[in-house]
Amino acid sequence: MSDNTLLLHTIMILDLEPNYNECRYCVRMLFNAVKFNNIRLVMHLLRNGVDPNFYDEYMRSPIHYAVEKGNTEMVKALLEHKADPNIFDDNFDYPITNSIIENKVEIVKILLQYGADKTMINEFDLLHDAIKNKHIDMAKILIDNGISLTMKDTDDYTPLHYAMLDNDTSVIYNLLDYIFKVKGYDVLGNIVHDILCNYDLYKETTLELLISYYIIISYLYRGIDLSDIYNSNIEILLNSKHLSDIKEKCENEIDVMKNAVICDGIAIIDLCTGYDANSIARNSVNLKRFSDTKLKIYRYYIEPIVEIGKYRRELLYNAINSMNEYCKSESNDIANWSCLPFEIKYKILENIKDDETLRKI
């Protein structure tokens, strides 16, 4: 149906002045307007009282079709007019589960905001599928909203198993880091435990990454409470020659990072946590050189920190150049900026903590 046909139907409705909530033509019109992404007609019908929870012969309501279309504006409009986010069709498909499976991140956020049932996400293997398909942003939303990280699928595997099996180190690191920061060390420990119990399924590189991340956390966050699951995991590592060799290599590199001091008198291990972007920026060149020459296992951990430093340093350099250009005119050089040494200019701008402010200079 074209927009012109929909418009004609709208005019007919307006002329007939029907009871919108009881008019079957109006309800059918709402379905068609949603299917054809006609937000103006949808809003007109909703404002005049058409029930957004009416369903068709497939038990599907307008919100099912809006989700299917991926139209965030339409989904939000329906929810604002009391569409039920937890309504299901004759296949027991829910708007929230469909949008998760189809990786419609913004729609999932909207559905959750308007009361979609969070318990539904544990009724299916949604996190398993998100990780299999490398939908990391979706996986993070599921983690934020309480999905079980140790739930096993029909093959008896937890979600992280599929990232490990795929040997995608970037995905594994992202997930481990996010789980630790959002859920804590104990939850991470339980996930690691399940992987270690099945370590023969995985490649050396992924096991190195998993074990190295788990071990370094206890060094970086010294106040962390090491629970029974930590001791159990260490015992598994020590009882396997293969795993204990990986553990030893990790600890040797950690010792190197503890003993290596760069130009600000800061140990590499300390620069990994607790220092601001300016400290990292000042030391990013030395940090990169150290990572390239001294590390093998923990290079993946240092590289993102180096990038933070490089970004901050480039931002400061660009801000200095912008200020230099602005102060070329004598009338603009109020604070005698042009007379200052580069090092002083750099130090002054370091005090601007907000990167957004620096970008505007």
From Swiss-Prot:
SUPFAM superfamilies from the UniProt entry: Ankyrin repeat
Top-level taxonomic group: Viruses
Pfam families listed in its UniProt record: Ank_2, Ank_5, PRANC
Residue spans of the ANK repeats: 25-54, 58-87, 91-120, 122-151, 155-184
Listed PROSITE patterns: ANK_REP_REGION, ANK_REPEAT
The entry's keywords: ANK repeat, Repeat
InterPro entries, alphabetized: Ankyrin_rpt (IPR002110), Ankyrin_rpt-contain_sf (IPR036770), PRANC_domain (IPR018272)
PANTHER family, alphabetized: ANKYRIN REPEAT AND SOCS BOX PROTEIN 8 (PTHR24134:SF9), ANKYRIN REPEAT-CONTAINING PROTEIN DDB_G0279043 (PTHR24134)
Listed name of the protein: Putative ankyrin repeat protein FPV227
UniProt organism field: Fowlpox virus (strain NVSL)
